[in-house]
Amino acid sequence: MEVFILELVLGSKNITLEDLINVTRKGYKVSISEEAYEKIDKARALVDKYVEEGKVSYGITTGFGKFAEVSISKEQTGQLQKNIVMSHSCNVGNPLPIDIAKGIVLLRAVNLAKGYSGARRIVIEKLVELLNKDVTPWIPEKGSVGSSGDLSPLAHMSLVLIGLGKAYYKGELLEAKDALAKADIEPIPALSSKEGLALTNGTQALTSTGAHVLYDAINLSKHLDIAASLTMEGLHGIIDAYDPRIGEVRGHLGQINTAKNMRNILAGSKNVTKQGVERVQDSYVLRCIPQIHGASKDTLEYVKQKVELELNAVTDNPIIFVDTDEVISGGNFHGQPMALPFDFLGIALSEMANVSERRIEKMVNPAINNGLPAFLVEKGGLNSGFMIVQYSAASLVSENKVLAHPASVDSIPTSANQEDHVSMGSVAAKKSKDIFENVRKVIGMELITACQAIDLKEAKDKLSPATKVAYDEVRKIISYVSEDRPMYIDIHAAEDLIKTNKIVENVEKAIGKLEF
């Protein structure tokens, strides 16, 4: 039987968001093209030439940051590169998830494969070997200001290459030297000129973090449309608001796609209604689903464009231009081009939870829930039902509003004011991750609340084919709430169900791909 090895070849073409996820979550192998090797060798030769001739070049024959004016001798260049890795590894807090840490390794390898950094072959080969043998650097999540790039988290990554720090081997946390030994990887004996800087100067930590959030947010936006459709079923929502002509006269693609999703998901439902039958129009959280969800989708699409640029960007400093024999100091390490999009990502995610929570409130509030019992429970008063589910959702939405404050508008100068404007892009990326995790919980709450409303309406036999699929997936693991029970169990189960992506996968099997 022929075995096909799924592989990403660096240097042959630009990588995509999907490529990143294939390596970090699906175990795709990585290799280096001959074209990339040629570029790497040429850039390295120019670095060696600068060192031999004693030319002044930042980070090659000088110190770093405020020490840029301090000359470093040829004999000290290797120690200089080891020192930057050791002294800059200052991150704190919980470790980054393994997939995000793998992404950092991959993106640094992509960067070096461009041939503008001047590191030797062995450096990029060791990064690739880490990926292919499932050794992942242990990197605490806090400590980067996003300029000069992600110095501290990338230093933690780089420690592993020289046998220092900590690393995971097949998920087990070990001292780096032990993880390397188990994987049969030899550490780099010594870093050479420019290599410590080439490893640590860039935006790969913030980019990997934000890229993984973005990938999951795209799938979550589909869950949001499905949850909203279940709510429409439970509240007998008016379908007219999703008429394609409404989107066409405004023109926003996210709105158009969301309306299409809603029409397709609800096609065949005998619960939804038409305007003027039960009431003239719905409140905004139902009627404006295409406009609200769609605006977040448009934002995700914008962020995706920026992310896929940055996945392939040269973010080193200085940059080696072999065609003109120049080593030029610039600012490609500055995280501002990604800090702003990741702040925008957090805002878009926050709004997804905002509207979802309002639909939960609409279902549990007897004044506005179209005839459902208060808090969706029989024997109300004795039972509180879904009352506190809405409290929990409100708490998470409120937290998101705080987290949605942009990090990129802040700057605290570093390195004795040599680095006098920083991006805080790593903070923006981390915030988007924290917001995402809250949003996923809130959408899980809407799923279980909507299924409860459907049961109370005795409407499950009138569901559309697609909403019936989603309803059944929920009911496989979360039963109808006939009397009070610990609701956190159901909430966590709903979140875990979203993590599996089974609802989206099975709905798409039933009706075709949902639009993003």
UniProtKB/Swiss-Prot annotation:
Tree of life domain: Bacteria
GO cellular component terms given for this protein: cytoplasm
EC top class, as a word: lyase
Covalent crosslink: 5-imidazolinone (Ser-Gly): S147-G149
Catalysed reactions, semicolon-separated: L-histidine = trans-urocanate + NH4(+)
One GO biological process term: L-histidine catabolic process to glutamate and formamide
Protein modification: Contains an active site 4-methylidene-imidazol-5-one (MIO), which is formed autocatalytically by cyclization and dehydration of residues Ser-Ser-Gly.
Subcellular locations according to the entry: Cytoplasm
Keywords: Cytoplasm, Histidine metabolism, Lyase
This protein's pathway: Amino-acid degradation; L-histidine degradation into L-glutamate; N-formimidoyl-L-glutamate from L-histidine: step 1/3
2,3-didehydroalanine (Ser) found at: S148
EC identifiers of the protein: 4.3.1.3
GO MF annotations, alphabetized: histidine ammonia-lyase activity
InterPro entries, sorted: Aromatic_Lyase, Fumarase/histidase_N, HutH, L-Aspartase-like, Phe/His_NH3-lyase_AS
Family indicated by similarity: Belongs to the PAL/histidase family.
Name the record gives this protein: Histidine ammonia-lyase 1
Source organism (scientific name): Fusobacterium nucleatum subsp. nucleatum (strain ATCC 25586 / DSM 15643 / BCRC 10681 / CIP 101130 / JCM 8532 / KCTC 2640 / LMG 13131 / VPI 4355)
